[in-house]
Amino acid sequence: MHLIIPDSYDPKLSVKDTQRAIRYIRETFQDEFGAQLNLSRLSAPMFVEKSTGLNDNLNGIEQPVSFTMQDMGDSQIEIVHSLAKWKRVALKRYGFNLHEGLYTNMNAIRKDEDLDNFHSAYVDQWDWEKVITKEERTLDTLKQTVRQIFKVIKHMEHEVWYKFPEAVHHLPDKIHFITTQELEDRFPDLTPRERENAITKELGCVFLMQIGGALKSGKRHDGRAPDYDDWQLNGDILFWYEPLKQAIEISSMGIRVDAESMQRQLKIADAEDRLSLPYHQMVLHEEVPFTIGGGIGQSRLCMLLLGKAHVGEVQAALWPQAMIDQCEAANIHLL
């Protein structure tokens, strides 16, 4: 557990008005986001069978919540960490065409999450995925899509200002692009998290690219599962968040692996045993479309747009009593 208490925190909205604002942001954003990227809303599962290989393994150390079901025999069922792989299969299953895509309201439990102002065991995000061609698996495609997403987020600042002018947190006008290697070259003596804070404070908003593989130092900037993002074609959208004087990650996204990049990354991750799983076989034999996709944090977006000090102000979850007490003493009202 780690908690940042901002100086003299004064929430601009009551708990009741905050709830109204959350609903407005969620409903407005998903409509504009879907229209901008040509995405249709789909219903999505809260749990999948472990044997399918569809769950997100995150960094490889987080354990999903699992259980059995009365009518499913000995099959292990897992609550999703995310829908990164499920979405790609869904695009095939439901017959989406080139440059069409889907988004879902994804709810997940990450029981091993380190809790702080930004991180909760309960994850709510818009998980999205879009069909592209093999030739479009490029940095240009990635950057163009990032700019589209940034455009919608920036427009949401104005939408929120119209409805809740006293609460809106102002966002930068431009997003900048930088790779993890460029960041390490520039700030070799800082930790990865410190580098993110330094560059985001300087530029306001950045898309940090190429996360997952080893840098020249031999270290990774951060971990990424080896079987959905191509580590050379992915990244995080980060905003400088002045209320907490830190960078806040709003989205993790990327162009998805093809057979070659998946095999290479699974070998690096010492996880080649996954190649026999149904999802991985579909990627190997090009039985699922080439795609780009990611997740956009719903609660984090609300937190960013409303200038909140803790994600627990915009979502109902469980927190240690010590964190609850410290927040109450600092005028931070957790739901």
From Swiss-Prot:
One Gene Ontology term of the biological-process aspect is: L-asparagine biosynthetic process
- What Pfam families does the database record attribute to this sequence? AsnA
- Give the location in the cell: Cytoplasm
Asked if the Swiss-Prot or TrEMBL record annotates the protein with the keyword RNA-binding, the reply is no
Q: Which SUPFAM superfamilies match?
A: Class II aaRS and biotin synthetases (SSF55681)
* Protein name per its UniProtKB record: Aspartate--ammonia ligase
**Which domain of life does the protein's organism represent?**
Bacteria
Q: Name one GO cellular component term.
A: cytosol
Write down the top EC class of this protein.
Answer: ligase
* Pathway(s) where this gene product acts: Amino-acid biosynthesis; L-asparagine biosynthesis; L-asparagine from L-aspartate (ammonia route): step 1/1
GO molecular function terms noted in the UniProt entry: aspartate-ammonia ligase activity; ATP binding; catalytic activity, acting on a protein; transferase activity
Entry keyword set: Amino-acid biosynthesis, Asparagine biosynthesis, ATP-binding, Cytoplasm, Ligase, Nucleotide-binding
Catalytic reactions of this protein: L-aspartate + NH4(+) + ATP = L-asparagine + AMP + diphosphate + H(+)
EC number of the protein: 6.3.1.1
Name the HAMAP family on file: AsnA
Q: What is its main location?
A: cytoplasm
The family this protein is said to belong to: Belongs to the class-II aminoacyl-tRNA synthetase family. AsnA subfamily.
The protein's matches in PANTHER family, at most eight in alphabetical order, are given as:
ASPARTATE--AMMONIA LIGASE (PTHR30073:SF5)
